[in-house]
């Protein structure tokens, strides 16, 4: 396959060949250029608060151990014994000073160093250099306000720079709210879909909500219920979409703090969020304070998505070109009353948990998109994401990134696939940066500040 062929994904992200959702050769290329190169979500501070705490996570198809060190730092290692390649840790989470392989008993410290080998002197003599046999370490581990990401590529930009313009929109909730927590362990389910299908949807697709989720909207009586069955468009000025250089993007639905949740939760959620408004107005200004109380439908490129006010946090772990393991956490504000946290966690399970009704609505879409990508006639067709193209702006006086000032559009789709195509066709971060020099002119007209 010619990965520099612009017909695979157009430079502006306007079109993508359907086969990208089902081609196994391309999937192997993604492991090399997407998952081995970009920042991938690992865990949250709240899940490993103390020295020795660890979780097992995934980076692409590889499993890693993420461990809090004695000095408070966080490191991550491949979950593979260096002796014969066996999986080292099978637990999802725990606290340990080290890890012992159940095959031959080799023991590794929480710092990844090989510390003990049964009968080392008797069997190996001086032939084994333990200093060279530690666990393979993930090159970069950094935090975005408590959310821990890892990257295998030393040449990647810092996590802060990688978040880029998207970070400006996320910080009101992730930082200025007082901080967030993830409630784990995550719910896990396998869907027969390519990882990009849900990732693109969560990057800000408000277009499907009224139709795909019609029955869920009617039964739940959320603040978005008026959209059910495409009975109406969101009113003018109801939201915006944005995207950024490295592919992260989102849709913003103004003042949607109670999210997708049903009427019984709305008064308490609105009261809790509203109590912070005066402080946030003073600290970060009225625009970003409004972003805090608005519903963000976001994907951090490539495979981490969340709905801020709905408390839904997902990672789309690829298994193969047509199979994805979905991890779902509940995301809550640290200072929420414990009873409200509990009720929000329950609501996340009802809506977007492994058997949630909103989740079930989406899965049929994701799976058939991916299944059709393998069929002979349909795989070479072009998928389009041109909704709102030509109306996006770069250089807005208020809102950073490429911005489409409508609740419904495909601005964030285009940014996601522009970055995706640039990575697939590049052999390194340096080449990606070179082909991305004009990323904003490919996606939007530029305004003078």
UniProtKB/Swiss-Prot annotation:
GO terms for molecular function: 2 iron, 2 sulfur cluster binding; iron ion binding; naphthalene 1,2-dioxygenase activity. InterPro entries: RHO_NdoB-like_C, Rieske_2Fe-2S, Rieske_2Fe-2S_sf, Ring-hydroxy_dOase_2Fe2S_BS, Ring_hydroxy_dOase_asu_C_dom, Rng_hydr_dOase-A. It holds the Pfam family Rieske. GO terms for biological process: catabolic process. Pathway: Aromatic compound metabolism; naphthalene degradation. Binds 1 [2Fe-2S] cluster per subunit. Binds 1 Fe(2+) ion per subunit. Keywords: 2Fe-2S, Aromatic hydrocarbons catabolism, Dioxygenase, Iron, Iron-sulfur, Metal-binding, NAD, Oxidoreductase. Its cofactor is [2Fe-2S] cluster; Fe(2+). Fe cation binds at residues 208, 213, 362. Residues 39-137 form the Rieske domain. Signal peptide: none annotated. [2Fe-2S] cluster binds at residues 81, 83, 101, 104. Its EC number is 1.14.12.12. It comes from the Bacteria. It catalyses: naphthalene + NADH + O2 + H(+) = (1R,2S)-1,2-dihydronaphthalene-1,2-diol + NAD(+). Component of the naphthalene dioxygenase (NDO) multicomponent enzyme system which catalyzes the incorporation of both atoms of molecular oxygen into naphthalene to form cis-(1R,2S)-dihydroxy-1,2-dihydronaphthalene. The alpha subunit has a catalytic role in the holoenzyme. The naphthalene dioxygenase (NDO) multicomponent enzyme system is composed of an electron transfer component and a dioxygenase component (iron sulfur protein (ISP)). The electron transfer component is composed of a ferredoxin reductase (NdoR) and a ferredoxin (NdoA), and the dioxygenase component is formed of a heterohexamer (trimer of heterodimers) of three large alpha subunits (NdoB) and three small beta subunits (NdoC). Belongs to the bacterial ring-hydroxylating dioxygenase alpha subunit family. This is Naphthalene 1,2-dioxygenase system, large oxygenase component. It comes from Pseudomonas aeruginosa. The gene is ndoB.
